[in-house]
Amino acid sequence: MVWIFSIFVKLLLVNGYRSTDFEVHRNWLSITYRLPIKEWYYDTTNIWTLDYPPLFAYFEYFLSHITPNFVIKDGCLDLMSEKISSQVYGETTVMWQRFTVILSEFILYLSLRSFSLLSNTNFLVCSSIILNPGFFILDHIHFQYNGFLFGLFISSIIAVKQEKYLKSALMFSISLCFKHIYLYLAPCYFVFLLRAYCLNFDNFEFKTYVSLIQIIQWKNLFKLAAVVLSTFIITFAPFIYIGYTLQDYQQILSRLFPFSRGLTHAYWAPNFWSIYSTIDKILTMLVKYLNKLKYIGSLRKIIDIPQLIAQIQLNETANNGSKGLVSDVTFNILPQIPPKITFALTLFYQLLALLPLFFNCNFKRFIGSLTLCGYGSYLFGWHVHEKAIMLVIIPFTFLVILDKRLLTPYMLLTSSGIVSLFPLLYTSQDFLIKIIYSLLWMIVYFVSINEVSEKNYVGQDRRVWFFDRLAMIYIVCLLPIVLISGVLDIFQFGNGKYEFLSLMLYSCYCSVGVFTSWIGLSWLYNFDEPLWV
């Protein structure tokens, strides 16, 4: 019934706003339909080039070949420049592509159905995922296929719960071959499957180095390796068959990992780098203000203001992060951040989540580690999209029902994460829809999860700490932030000079919620051992 209700709501949204992601997927349909496979990752007819792994390309190929003739005649599969593409197709194409998103989301329903029937608690988790505002915003208004992809990913999580480790490895490998963003979560799967399925420390006693070899369950290790490797080999089999060379595979990698896109996205995802960028903006404004003062002689001994002003003027034509451009970002005051710094930070914080998992390998630890790996990649990764917050929200949903202490970080994450998606829907007709639906979802599921987690809490009596009250104040203040941002968008203060101000407000305020929730979960994960037994 929940899924049927969700379909009804989605059908009401088919005529709503759609983003350029609609053009992206329409162009991918055209590429896979009109061109031979060897040209898929080389075509530049349209700026919306194919930049997803091969399995998703095959998915687009499948959709293009089941497209009805009347939709093809509408221009759905015409390969053309982005300058004229929107003038060629009509509403028939829009309806068809909307329908494919709704239909593909059946995978999400299938992955959750059997799990939801096991208990009322599981049903609560599954229904909250199916009705999550993030999927409604990203897939059924903005336009993407996240529900379908997360259905595959969730299947791997549920397989871990059922101790079907080979199935989990298979489903995660398939997910990775559909969308490479799941690569951020691969370390958690690697450590867990290695420890739970391939290593046996029962009655282990180190005598010689032979003892270390004996803890390896070689049969399981080979089976696991066979499942993972065969998935990737089958995925790339068509490219192998047509004789792709090393240079051709490098072309695919360059499409999947375009480092030239810069540290931050056009709209800053609410992570550490949005705070970093904001501080750089504030320092830039401060330096400009100090430069106008007459009495700054003493300051010149500490700060070389003329040199900073010269640097700021030099960067005026560059992408300073607030121009809505997708390219390398240049900071005026703070040090520049290369990709290796983001990778090092991501790896460091993921390692902190992986070590406890290796020594205490169970489902609770796995979900906790998976969530923290998602946090690490989202907060410190390179060119993170705001949509990637779902990589953290979905695993955390399986975790929060296990204990009351996890509720506050979860509410902080989901509320700030969902609100951070609001700028994707900037038209007036979507303003009330996104607010009312998200607000209703938060009220219903925050209250329900609170009741369930209270029953599952087996520790000592829990006090309501100041942090919890502060978190509630933060969540309530999200609504004024949304309204203020709406006013800024309407009036465009400063004749458009501060057009990025509302996005900066969203990004900075939501980053506080995401960052605080990460700290809260990290503390519980590393220092509250009874919670993970």
Where are these regions (language model features)?
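Hydrophobic alpha-helical transmembrane segments in multi-pass integral membrane proteins
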Residues: E60, Q97-L108, L112
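Membrane-interfacial catalytic/cofactor-binding modules of polytopic membrane enzymes
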Residues: F22-N27, I31-F70, L77-R98, P133-L149, ...
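General structural concept
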Residues: V2-P68, I154-K161, Y165-M171, F204-I213
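Hydrophobic transmembrane alpha-helices
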Residues: Y109, R113, L117, F153-Q162, ...
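Histidine/cysteine- and/or acidic
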Residues: K161-H265
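Alpha-helical transmembrane segments
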Residues: M1-K10, E105, C126, I475-V482, ...
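Membrane-embedded helix bundles of polyisoprenyl
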Residues: S86, L103, T121-I158, Y165-A186, ...
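Start-transfer (signal-anchor) and selected internal transmembrane alpha helices
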Residues: M1-N15, S114-F123, W518, W523
